[in-house]
From Swiss-Prot:
It comes from Haemophilus influenzae (strain 86-028NP). The modification Phosphoserine is found at residue 102. This is Phosphoglucosamine mutase. It is an enzyme of class 5 (isomerase). InterPro entries: A-D-PHexomutase_a/b/a-I (IPR005844), A-D-PHexomutase_a/b/a-I/II/III (IPR016055), A-D-PHexomutase_a/b/a-II (IPR005845), A-D-PHexomutase_a/b/a-III (IPR005846), A-D-PHexomutase_C (IPR005843), A-D-PHexomutase_C_sf (IPR036900), A-D-PHexomutase_CS (IPR016066), Alpha-D-phosphohexomutase_SF (IPR005841). Gene3D superfamilies: Alpha-D-Glucose-1,6-Bisphosphate, subunit A, domain 3, Alpha-D-phosphohexomutase, C-terminal domain. SUPFAM superfamilies: Phosphoglucomutase, C-terminal domain, Phosphoglucomutase, first 3 domains. The lineage of its organism: Bacteria, Pseudomonadati, Pseudomonadota, Gammaproteobacteria, Pasteurellales.
Length: 445
């Protein structure tokens, strides 16, 4: 893949008002994407967003650029990222655009594209858009300008899609569920899905004002959800992130159930029903206990680099349909083409309803090993992980942990940091080993 100036692993992202998340760049990006897509015969693009106040500005700029290139835009309003992937397919749109910075604060935003199939744009299309961004803007003839329209029933369509992934012979009657929508894009979707399946729903994080997305709520901070589940004696709590592609859960005792445990529950249920295709893809950060639990079921497990994009790539390489991250990105490829928080949570709720078991009981098969993470700042220049001294200490630690844990040493891609992660059943040993490696890295500085 060629070096990109604008597109990262998850589209274009940054702080609002700072290049490239500016109205003039969004206008140019809309035009460039429009020119490239129009050359492929495209006529219409879907545009969705989360609840950030900057979404209004960016969607208007994108639409103007697309129109200048001769493409029409259909707005969905605030919708989860996976909903745009789904609607792009069902509307037969040539592409979908999502304006979101996912789990980031309100002052960040981003723009990413889906193909007509609801997957990431092919590399060659992204590269063509990047090349077009270097060209001066022009405008098609007046009669060929694009139009703008609104899809008024977008939410209803996606609600029906989500409900359709839940087994028809099961319901959620008798379940009390607390749902935290992070004041984000699922605020008008998830509560309705759950109610229509029969659950009693208590809502938090469903009052977006443009500035409170992901603020002390949602999948990245389940503290409020844990308290509400215990206070209301609910059966389960669900926390989505700002754009609805992540899920974290809380059991009836207030314990957090993370992406690794959720992935295991879904995998075991798929195995029992004969629907598991191949194995499961996790990441370098997936807890060792997940790997061990899957091994006990005879389920193959592979690790991808961190990032849902890389998880999906490895799934496609192996023709598997299930993968995810401990952060709560869960991809069930036979249901949607991208991580879908609502769909993943429904898969877990279906397992609870099917077996009359609590989330606590279902998650107990994966007793997460303690993870110790130490970030060590270095002066830049040579990578400390290439040092013989660090390699020697790391090798000695690995020998001590053999069979009981593992280490992961990574150089940050964005900062001069070495990330030292040690995972072990024995928390004290994990801490001790992490400190030894971190000390060796510091000495190189």
């Amino acid at each position: 893949m060629a070096n990109r100036k604008y597109f990262g692993t998850d589209g274009v992202r940054g702080k609002v008002g700072s290049y490239p998340i500016t109205p003039d760049f969004a206008l140019k990006l809309g035009w460039a994407a429009g020119k490239v897509l129009a050359s492929q015969g495209s006529k219409m693009v879907l545009i969705g967003k989360d609840t950030r106040i900057s979404g209004y500005m960016l969607e208007s700029a994108l639409e103007a650029g697309l129109a200048a290139a001769g493409l029409s835009a259909a707005f969905t309003g605030p919708m989860p990222t996976p909903a745009i992937a789904y609607l792009t397919r069902t509307f037969r749109a040539e592409a979908g655009i999502v304006i979101s910075a996912s789990h980031n604060p309100y002052y960040d935003n981003g723009i990413k594209f889906f193909s007509a199939k609801g997957t990431k744009l092919p590399d060659e299309i992204e590269e063509a858009i990047e090349a077009m961004l270097e060209q001066p803007m022009d405008c098609v003839e007046s009669a060929e300008l694009g139009k703008a329209s609104r899809i008024n029933d977008a939410a209803g369509r996606y609600i029906e899609f989500c409900k359709g992934t839940f087994p028809a012979h099961l319901g959620l009657e008798g379940y009390k569920i607390v749902v935290d929508c992070a004041n984000g894009a699922t605020y008008h979707i998830a509560p309705n899905v759950l109610r229509e399946l029969g659950a009693e729903v208590i809502e938090i994080g469903t009052d977006p004002n443009g500035l409170n997305i992901n603020e002390k709520c949602g999948a990245t901070d389940v503290t409020a959800l844990q308290a509400k589940v215990v206070e209301t004696k609910a059966d389960v709590g669900l926390a989505y992130d700002g754009d609805g592609d992540r899920i974290m859960m809380v059991d009836h005792l207030g314990n957090k159930v993370d992406g690794d445990q959720i992935l295991f529950i879904i995998a075991r249920e798929a195995l029992r029903s004969g629907q598991l295709k191949g194995g499961v893809v996790g990441t370098l950060m997936s807890n060792m206990s997940l790997e061990i639990a899957l091994k006990m079921l005879g389920v193959p497990f592979l690790r991808a680099n961190v990032g849902d994009r890389y998880v999906l790539e490895k799934m496609l390489e192996n023709d598997w349909t299930l993968g995810g991250e401990n952060s709560g990105h869960i991809i069930i490829a036979d249901k949607n083409t991208t991580g879908d928080g609502i769909v993943a949570s429904l898969a877990v709720l279906a397992a609870m309803a099917q077996h009359k078991l609590s989330l606590n009981e279902l998650a107990s098969a994966v007793k997460l090993f303690p993870q110790v993470l130490i970030n060590v700042r270095f002066a830049g220049g040579e990578n400390p992980l290439e040092s013989d001294a660090v390699k020697s200490v790391a090798a000695e630690v690995e020998k001590r942990l053999e069979g009981k844990g593992r280490i992961l040493l990574r150089k940050s891609g964005t900062e001069p940091l070495i990330r030292v992660m040690v995972e072990c059943q024995d928390a004290e040993l994990a801490q001790q080993c992490a400190e030894e490696i971190a000390e060796a890295v510091k000495k190189i500085n």
